[in-house]
């Protein structure tokens, strides 16, 4: 039986890959190009995290992440009528992947013995940098740099993780609550049009 953090890792990979493939399809990429975008979305943030932690990037040790991304492509192809045509498909899968990857990044960083503030930074990188790479590949302004609550949702989830660590909650419950808080922060921010003020320069 897999532990909760492994479940988060693979589920997040699947969700993020779908979000990348969904956007690639909107740009009329072929299936291979869409797969590449999906893989980059799924492993990009974790790769940067591992490099900063002086670790071998996780997907180089386990090809299963590339296989999960391929399954995401097959999922989109099989259910393209629903996945591609529904406008909120990208948002939902992206929010799911964001929340799950934040806790994966935090947990791995803590396992390496780093302090909590570093773990929150790494959780934010794990959650948001794959999406940044995705947006660059498809020639879009990275979502992380827009006024949307995106990276801040990751930081919020990290703070919730830290607060929960001060309680008697199990590790799995802490990770679940943290991931859920990131997901809900994204949903609420979009639903109620909550955003960060834009820094305007002189015209």
Segments predicted by a language model, with ranges:
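N-terminal topogenic module of multi-pass integral membrane proteins
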Residues: 1-53
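C-terminal ends of transmembrane helices
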Residues: 17-27, 50, 74-87, 132-142, ...
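Intrinsically disordered, low-complexity non-transmembrane regions of multi-pass membrane transporters
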Residues: 1, 194-203
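Ordered, amphipathic secondary-structure segments that act as subunit-interaction surfaces
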Residues: 71-108
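Structural signature of hydrophobic alpha-helical transmembrane segments
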Residues: 2-13, 57-71, 115-127
């Amino acid at each position: 039986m897999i532990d909760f953090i492994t479940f988060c890792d693979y589920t997040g990979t699947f969700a993020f890959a779908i979000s990348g493939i969904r956007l690639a399809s909107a740009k009329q990429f072929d299936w291979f190009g869409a797969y590449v975008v999906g893989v980059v979305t799924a492993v990009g943030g974790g790769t940067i995290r591992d490099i900063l932690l002086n670790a071998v990037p996780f997907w180089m040790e386990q090809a299963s992440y590339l296989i999960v991304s391929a399954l995401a492509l097959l999922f989109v192809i099989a259910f393209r009528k629903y996945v591609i045509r529904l406008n909120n498909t990208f948002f939902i899968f992206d929010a799911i992947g964001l929340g799950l990857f934040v806790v994966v990044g935090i947990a791995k960083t803590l396992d390496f013995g780093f302090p909590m503030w570093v773990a929150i930074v790494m959780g934010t990188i794990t959650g948001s940098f794959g999406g940044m790479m995705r947006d660059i590949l498809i020639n879009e302004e990275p979502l992380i740099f827009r006024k949307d609550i995106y990276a801040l949702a990751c930081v919020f989830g990290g703070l919730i993780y830290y607060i929960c660590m001060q309680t008697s909650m199990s590790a799995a419950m802490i990770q679940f609550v943290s991931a859920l808080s990131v997901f809900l922060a994204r949903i609420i921010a979009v639903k109620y049009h909550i955003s960060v003020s834009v820094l305007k320069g002189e015209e």
